[in-house]
Amino acid sequence: MGFLLLALAILPFMRSRPASLDWHRDKDEAFQTARATHKPVLAFLYADWCTYCRQMDSTTFRDPHVIKDLGRRFVWLRLNAETNPEGADLQRRFGVEGYPTLLILDESGNEIDRLSGFVPPDQFPERLQALVDGPDSFPGLEQRLEENPDSAEVNFKIASKYLERKQFQEAGEHFGRAVALDPENQSGLADDGLYYIAGTEAMLGQVDNALATLKELRTRFPQCYYST
């Protein structure tokens, strides 16, 4: 009798712990769930040939702590970015160039941030949480920039986020702001900033501007890594 009562007492807790991540394989269904539950979507984009994608599947996504701590905090969506039309659409829309990539999307499908490459299970929860609501998450950086628009560091960090999203115009503007705020390279941002500005200009088809920026980099900071 005592064993039966104990079993009945712990049964609800056993049922409340997911045994695995509840993956959606249909984008519309995933976002329907996200809107109903007001949870962000984690869209895992992978390819069949991707070794690190398989490693994420066999380790990180099967880790009991990941499942327990994160399983019900997000809506999980997995799509093959090469063979699934919905996966290919997300790949094009968000400029994903490597796998695995985990897009963190709000319930309306807007990108919050992203996690690229293999992340082991012991690092995954902390890194994911930092991207969702940490000070260096995209929303966190937007807030920090609003509070301190003259921070070279914040401008550089948000520029890097834009660059990762292939938003080259916005990236170049904030890299330029970082360079202007650190003209003597005291924070070690101006030389990197000029290099990345040249890259954004090249991606925007502004080849002459890119060459001029590289010349400026070599002139102002001849000892930097990019000038050698």
Predicted regions and their residues:
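Thiol-based oxidoreductase modules, predominantly thioredoxin-like and allied folds used
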Residues: 21-25, 46, 59-86, 99
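Short active-site neighborhood of thiol/selenol oxidoreductases, capturing the structured segment around
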Residues: 37-50
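Structural micro-motif
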Residues: 39-41, 88-104
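Non-catalytic, surface beta->alpha helical segment in thiol-disulfide oxidoreductase systems
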Residues: 61, 96-136
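Short solvent-exposed coil/turn linkers within tandem alpha-helical repeat scaffolds
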Residues: 64, 114-118, 148-150, 165, ...
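Structural register within alpha-helical repeat arrays
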Residues: 157-158, 197
